[in-house]
Amino acid sequence: MKRKETYLSRDFRETVALRFPARAKELNTAFDMRLSALLAENADASKEKQYHLKWQILPGISAYETLQRVMPKEEALQTVHGYVERLARTSHKQLAALLYIPGLYRLVPGVFVKSTRSVFGPAAGFDPKELQAGNGVWRVDMMKCPYHDTCTEYGCPELCRCFCDSDDISYTGLHPKLIWHRTKTLGRGDDRCDFCMKVKK
């Protein structure tokens, strides 16, 4: 069965086709083999965690490692960061456009509460400590994160920052009456991610 392409695998293939055409076949094969091995090693992860592993974490690690065959480590990191950033900017545009609907911005903190509980909960390998959920405020301290844990486990903790930055790009400045605030992230070396999205009073 053919594996579904993710935005990371698609962008990786585009990079190698444009920049390393003579080695594109070899690099694509190396990427696919590494990703298959990573997926096999994580096959026993929960369904909830698999969502994050398959969509972003493992393709990100595979792209990062494979690109280092043809470019310096820092350039490989910035290249993968570019893939993640591009998706985040698209996501920001779509969300901001949606929030033109009058009054819709008020619902955003509540949506964050629900998505944290359903997609970013313990079953997926996260450890959220809910500090405030209601009255136009969502505040959560994330004490454990599979993005950070998996990148660290595979010897590339620096890759996690791409995903941390993605949140900031996606959610900063969505609406004049919404405040996205975060001073710490696990991926940047802190002891937690202190998430906050609130309606400006």
Report each predicted region and the residues it spans:
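N-terminal, charged low-complexity regulatory/assembly segments
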Residues: M1-L67
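Amphipathic interaction/junction segments at domain boundaries or subunit interfaces
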Residues: W55, T66-G155, L159
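C-terminal non-catalytic interaction appendages of large macromolecular assemblies
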Residues: G136-D141, P146-T150, Y154-K201
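Unusually extended, aromatic-enriched hydrophobic runs near protein termini
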Residues: L8, K49, L99-G125, G173-K198
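Secondary-structure boundary/capping signal
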Residues: A24, E75, L178-I179
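Generic structural motif
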Residues: R3, F31, F126-E130, W180
